[in-house]
Amino acid sequence: MIAEMLTCIALNVYYEARSEPLEGQYAVAHVVLNRVADDKFPNDACKVVYQGLEKGIGRCQFSWYCDGKSDTPRERRAWLDSQLVAHKVV
């Protein structure tokens, strides 16, 4: 369960902020955690990251998930950095 949560947060950091400085990457990770803590959002990091598509309206909380492209990270260094950020915030 924790591994899945870390992967979801890391994917979100990767796709939303991989070209940003570390501060921006941490901010994206904290957005997910803040939403998990908010009653208006699901209480699960993966459900927060993937929220929206299930309603069939094509609008997700994070646009990379609804863009129709592969969700497999291609930039190794950026993916490793995103995983590190996820581990540090959790």
Give, region by region, the residue ranges found by the protein language model:
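Bacterial extracytoplasmic/cell-wall-associated proteins, especially those involved in peptidoglycan
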Residues: 2-90
